[in-house]
Swiss-Prot record:
The lineage of its organism: Bacteria, Pseudomonadati, Pseudomonadota, Gammaproteobacteria, Pseudomonadales. PROSITE patterns: OMPR_PHOB, RESPONSE_REGULATORY. Residues 125-219 bind DNA. GO terms for molecular function: phosphorelay response regulator activity; transcription cis-regulatory region binding. PANTHER family: REGULATOR OF RPOS, RESPONSE REGULATOR PROTEIN CARR. The modification 4-aspartylphosphate is found at D51. It comes from the Bacteria. InterPro entries: CheY-like_superfamily, OmpR/PhoB-type_DNA-bd, Sig_transdc_resp-reg_C-effctor, Sig_transdc_resp-reg_receiver, WalR-like, WH-like_DNA-bd_sf. Keywords: DNA-binding, Phosphoprotein, Transcription, Transcription regulation, Two-component regulatory system. This is Response regulator protein CarR. Pfam families: Response_reg, Trans_reg_C.
Length: 223
């Protein structure tokens, strides 16, 4: 999952970048509101973390612009502004959630997970479950037939994206766009390598190949 972090306080941004990367997210960071307005509307992000007090352009104005353009990407406002009126303004502008600084890193992690599940119609789940597999996002492993299967960081990122899009045909290019940040060279052939690793661990039927199209997450057959 690819996230955009818009935060002008460098120490906090560095801390969040490190934490989110450990959680298996590909993260792009911007500190200027003008840059964020353009990149947030043009790149295929799965979620945006947006500070309100930004240089260049205020975060609330950017959010209103995105929603006016029809951008449906989940947006979590992360700000020191904690008054009730400002929370209302943020939610009215189109924010999906609002977290006031200071905050506990685990709360941010859980809110991000919940927003991503909700965005994919899985809001009623406390953990990510799809087609016979349950993903433990804290330990970055998957439960198969009652047993935990360890995953590498790359396998975890790829499987999480598949499980959030069950039944959808996803091209290598699409997967690369959502699994790597803007600074990483995107080699779609690497996707094939990680798919094969997941098949060896979970069974070949878990991820189908659609020739000329990409891959489809089918999960584990019941029984």
């Amino acid at each position: 999952m690819r996230l955009l972090l818009v935060e002008d306080h460098v120490p906090l941004a560095d801390e969040l970048m490190a934490s989110l990367t450990r959680q298996g997210y590909a993260v792009d960071w911007l500190a200027d509101g003008r840059d964020a307005a353009v990149q947030g509307a043009s790149e295929p992000y799965d979620l945006i973390i947006l500070d309100l007090g930004l240089p260049g352009r205020p975060g609330l104005e950017i959010l209103q612009e995105w929603r006016g353009l029809g951008l449906a990407t989940p947006v979590l406002i992360l700000t020191a502004r904690g008054s009730w009126a400002e929370r209302i303004d943020g939610l009215k502008a189109g924010a999906d959630d609002y977290l006031t600084k200071p905050f506990h890193p685990e709360e941010l992690a859980l809110r991000i997970q919940a927003l991503l599940r909700r965005a994919h119609g899985l809001a009623n789940q406390s953990q990510l479950e799809a087609a016979g597999l349950r993903l433990d996002e804290q330990r970055q492993c998957v439960c198969l037939n009652g047993a935990d299967v360890d995953l590498t960081a790359a396998e975890f990122r790829l499987l999480r994206y598949f499980m959030l899009h069950p039944g959808q045909v996803l091209s290598k290019g699409h997967l690369a766009e959502h699994l790597y940040d803007g600074e990483t060279e995107r080699d779609s052939n690497v996707i094939e390598v990680h798919v094969n690793h997941l098949r060896r661990k979970l069974g070949r039927e878990v991820i189908e190949t659609r020739r000329g199209q990409g891959y489809r997450y089918a999960g584990v057959a019941a029984g």
